[in-house]
Amino acid sequence: MRIHVVLGNDETGERIYLTSKNRRNTPDRLELKKYSPKLRKVVTFKEIK
């Protein structure tokens, strides 16, 4: 079953990315490298509960 998750950046507090994940395959929190418009570079965005 796929669920929707919000990705946030700890440095800037941005929550601009929405994605989905399969809970069975990735039970841990998701971490993806995405572009941050505020920082103008690619940074790590983590899943927010």
UniProtKB/Swiss-Prot annotation:
PROSITE patterns in the cross-refs: RIBOSOMAL_L33 (PS00582)
Family matches, as Gene3D superfamilies: Ribosomal protein L33
Keyword Transcription regulation attributed: no
Cellular component, GO, one term: ribonucleoprotein complex
SUPFAM superfamilies reported in the protein's UniProt record: Zn-binding ribosomal proteins (SSF57829)
InterPro entries: Ribosomal_bL33, Ribosomal_bL33_CS, Ribosomal_bL33_sf, Ribosomal_zn-bd
Top-rank taxon, per record: Bacteria
GO terms for MF: structural constituent of ribosome
Any one Pfam family match given in the protein's UniProt record, by short name: Ribosomal_L33
A biological process from GO: translation
Keywords of the record: Ribonucleoprotein, Ribosomal protein
Family: Belongs to the bacterial ribosomal protein bL33 family.
HAMAP family the record matches: Ribosomal_bL33 (MF_00294)
Protein's UniProt name: Large ribosomal subunit protein bL33
Organism, scientific name: Leuconostoc citreum (strain KM20)
Record lineage: Bacteria, Bacillati, Bacillota, Bacilli, Lactobacillales
Gene assigned in the entry: rpmG
